[in-house]
UniProtKB/Swiss-Prot annotation:
ATP binds at G68, P69, E70, S71, S72, G73, K74, T75. This is Protein RecA. Can catalyze the hydrolysis of ATP in the presence of single-stranded DNA, the ATP-dependent uptake of single-stranded DNA by duplex DNA, and the ATP-dependent hybridization of homologous single-stranded DNAs. It interacts with LexA causing its activation and leading to its autocatalytic cleavage. The gene is recA. One of its GO terms (molecular function) is damaged DNA binding. The keyword DNA-binding applies. SUPFAM superfamilies: P-loop containing nucleoside triphosphate hydrolases, RecA protein, C-terminal domain.
Length: 347
């Protein structure tokens, strides 16, 4: 027979007191004890993607996975997040396992390359050990690992070319994520893992595509983004950029499976102004009549390219449109380096 209610409450209070004595105050708490503020975020640089994420950007204190085919815009999205974190006064680190980071391109996207911490590790173990130490310092706001596929275990590097190393990388990723997830939550650091696609052999039904590094990252990631290039943007006959679609495949902080489309211009990155025009038209703030775009009676230009240039030259108008869109959709928490909210980690 179950003990009476008062006895159960007393037993629970004793247990909680014992836990606090052993493990410190706050080891166990009731979820309703504290008023939870909105999860603070790092904007992605595209308002369409911020809206698709549901909270106005990438959540702090979480693991994010960005994957997709080659040259789809994965690193560009990550670098824009780095630039936005730095603009808010944050500290960023980039672990360049592929040894392919272009500082000039990063600078064009708004990244402060002088203060960006960069590591080009020799092995996967070294890369993840550096990541763990940086996260545990508590000083980092955003960390990018580019890419999971390039995190080669030491045994594979030191072995012969034809040797079999089944599951080594998956075990390495699983161990690393077990270690860093709690530290991310405590420090409020956002960790972005960029990943590549592979094809499973012999798949008859469903998609044969899969990501590298085993299944651990799929479980630990709070947000997974599938980035695809869907169209080439042209100025006459010259290719000037790509139309990109991002699908939020997994989202623990908002409803998943939303999609966002935006332009990535060669040498310039995500077109914030182009994204504002798309969202402004969709939500009725910008009026499109034929090829003309109008905002509150003021003509932005004929054709999207001219409207984009107008917003680029008139930042106050662009900021006003962005503010109205965010207010209508009720997204976007204030982000400052001094006011980081540790996000709870759920598995």
């Amino acid at each position: 027979m179950a003990p009476q209610a008062p006895d159960r409450e007393k037993a629970l209070e004793l247990a909680l007191a014992q836990i606090e004595k052993s493990h410190g105050k706050g080891s166990v708490m009731r979820l309703g004890d504290e008023v939870r503020a909105p999860i603070s975020v790092i904007p992605t640089g595209s308002i369409a993607l911020d809206v698709a994420l549901g909270i106005g950007g990438l959540p702090r204190g979480r693991v994010i996975e960005i994957y997709g085919p080659e040259s789809s815009g994965k690193t560009t999205v990550a670098l824009h997040a780095v630039a936005n974190a730095q603009a808010a006064g944050g500290i960023a680190a980039f672990i360049d396992a592929e040894h392919a980071l272009d500082p000039d391109y990063a600078k064009k996207l708004g990244v402060d390359t002088d203060s960006l911490l960069v590591s080009q590790p020799d092995t996967g173990e070294q890369a993840l050990e550096i990541a763990d130490m940086l996260i545990r310092s508590g000083a980092l706001d955003i960390l990018v690992i580019d890419s999971v596929a390039a995190l080669v275990p030491r045994a594979e590097i030191e072995g012969e070319m034809g040797d079999s190393h089944v599951g080594l990388q998956a075990r390495l990723m699983s161990q690393a994520l077990r270690k860093i997830t709690g530290a991310l939550s405590n420090s409020g650091t956002t960790a972005i893992f960029i990943n590549q696609l592979r094809e499973k052999i012999g798949v008859m039904f469903g998609s044969p595509e899969t990501t590298t590094g085993g299944k651990a990252l799929k479980f630990y990631a709070s947000v997974r983004m599938d980035v695809r290039r869907i169209e080439t943007l042209k100025d006459g006959t010259d290719a000037v950029g790509n139309r990109t679609r991002v699908k939020i495949v997994k989202n623990k902080v908002s409803p998943p499976f939303k999609q966002a489309e935006f332009d990535i211009l060669y040498g310039k990155g995500i077109s914030k102004e182009g994204s504002l025009i798309d969202m402004g038209v969709e939500h009725g703030f910008i009026r499109k009549s034929g090829s003309w775009f109008t905002y509150e009676g003021e003509q932005l230009g004929q054709g999207k390219e001219n409207a984009r240039k107008f917003l680029l030259e008139n930042g106050d108008v662009a900021n006003e449109i962005e503010k109205k869109i965010k207010e209508k959709l009720n997204i976007g928490a204030v982000v400052t380096a001094d006011d980081v909210l540790p996000a709870p980690v759920d598995f």
